[in-house]
Regions:
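Alpha-helical multi-pass transmembrane bundles of energy-transducing inner-membrane proteins
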Residues: 5-92, 177-190, 194-242
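Hydrophobic residues within the alpha-helical transmembrane core of Major Facilitator Superfamily
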Residues: 8, 59, 144, 263-266, ...
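Hydrophobic/aromatic positions within or immediately flanking transmembrane alpha-helices
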Residues: 23-24, 54-55, 131, 164, ...
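Juxtamembrane/interfacial segments at transmembrane-helix boundaries in multi-pass membrane proteins
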Residues: 46-48, 62-119, 144-162, 210, ...
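Hydrophobic alpha-helical transmembrane segments of multi-pass membrane proteins
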Residues: 55, 98-105, 132, 162-166, ...
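Acidic, glycine-rich loop-and-beta core segments that form the ion-binding/anion-interacting portion
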Residues: 118-120, 124-128, 136-222
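Final/C-terminal transmembrane alpha-helix of multipass membrane proteins
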Residues: 193, 336-356
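Predominantly late transmembrane helices and immediately cytosolic-facing juxtamembrane segments
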Residues: 225-228, 289, 293-331
Length: 374
């Protein structure tokens, strides 16, 4: 029931055309997620993780609510179609932009307001982590596309250097932090923050390639990270632990699992032939046109991400095989295979033939850039 409620709120966020309704459903997502983590979390820290998620999101939403009230008092409407035709003064844009940014930055999340995410992932049940990584994080990116870029183009251009700096810090910092993690879920959680740093880099590049790349990267990240959390859930069901030091040599007892894990690891790195490569490549092309120095720093972070991803695969799947009880050594079940296979094929399909998405994105992204003059 909670998952259906959560999915319903998420669908409404992406479909409403009214700013007030957008805010209501944007924040309503928090309620079922709070309950899922607080009740069905995996350890005694679940209450703290749920409250952190609640407080971080609530703090950002206060600023967004004040900004919405300010817009409604001036425009007399909350309809996106009408608001897109209005022009706000530069000074008002700068203030309103910051208010909305405070909420979207927490949700996506950006460094330094990302601390709730690793704890939420660690404590959430597997299905909760999949929805959190696959869809919930994308609400922030959607907010940038739906609100900040079209309604406040001058402010978006003004704050682009700030976004670029925060994005580069996120990519480098999370890549280094991930190398120190000992929990499987924390590794994927911190890598998600780094990938979202690349998303914000592309969204504020101000060109077609960057924005299209960010959207593709969000889609790819949703599939890849969701699949990785499902695979972590599979080994947790067998071994009842996510501590990396406990594992080793699983390739010998779970060869099919190892194949899927290796494929999604390559996708997480952004190897050519995967959907993540298409998104990252377009993001870097777009960002390179805006700020070469920051883009080079972010490329360094991508190299570091390859390091921790391959280290994780080597530590868990390869190495000296450890002795496990017989009931822990069985390979993927038929159910697990059938929900991982579509994810793997999607990553391959979008990596080989990305035009299926790019062709759809050309018109709306071009319209966004033309109308906002960003």
């Amino acid at each position: 029931m909670l998952f259906l409620l959560l999915e319903g709120f998420l669908m409404l966020v992406f479909t409403v055309l009214d700013l007030i309704l957008f805010y209501i459903f944007f924040e309503s997502v928090l309620i079922p997620m709070f309950i899922l983590i607080g009740i069905w979390g995996s350890s005694q820290q679940r209450i703290m993780a749920a409250y952190q998620l609640f407080l971080y999101t609530l703090l950002g939403s206060v600023f967004m609510l004040v900004a919405i009230l300010g817009i409604y008092s001036q425009a007399g409407t909350a309809d996106f179609l009408v608001l897109n035709t209005l022009e706000f003064s530069t000074s008002r844009q700068l203030v309103l932009w910051l208010a909305f940014f405070a909420s979207f930055a927490v949700k996506i999340p950006m460094v330094p307001v990302h601390l709730w995410l690793p704890k939420a992932h660690v404590e959430a049940p597997t299905a909760g982590s999949v929805i959190l990584a696959g869809i919930l994080l994308k609400l922030g990116g959607y907010g940038f596309l739906r609100v900040l870029l079209p309604l406040f183009p001058e402010a978006s251009a003004f704050y682009t250097p700030l976004i670029f700096i925060m994005s580069s810090v996120a990519v480098i910092y999370t890549s280094l932090t991930t190398l120190q993690q000992t929990d499987l879920k924390r590794v994927i959680a911190y890598s998600s923050v780094g990938h979202m740093g690349l998303v914000t880099l592309g969204l504020f590049s101000g060109n077609l390639q960057g924005i299209e790349g960010s959207i593709i990267l969000m889609i790819s990240h949703g599939v890849v990270s969701g699949a990785l959390f499902l695979m972590i859930g599979s080994v947790y069901d067998r071994h009842h632990t996510r501590e990396i030091r406990y594992f080793g040599g699983l390739v010998y007892t779970m060869p099919l699992y190892a194949i899927f894990f290796f494929w999604f690891t390559l996708a997480n790195i952004g190897l050519p032939g995967t959907s993540s490569f298409v998104g990252e490549f377009l993001v870097f092309i777009g960002a390179f046109q805006t700020n070469t120095t920051v883009t080079v720093f972010c490329m360094t972070g991508v190299i570091l991400s390859a390091g921790y991803s391959l280290w994780l695969f080597n530590r868990v799947l390869l190495g000296n095989p450890k002795t496990y009880p017989l009931e822990m050594t069985y390979d993927l079940t038929r159910r697990e295979f059938y929900y991982l296979l579509p994810c793997a094929l999607t990553v391959l399909w979008l990596g080989i033939y990305p035009n299926v998405i790019i062709d759809v994105l050309h018109l709306p992204v071009s319209t966004l850039l033309y109308q906002s003059s960003f």
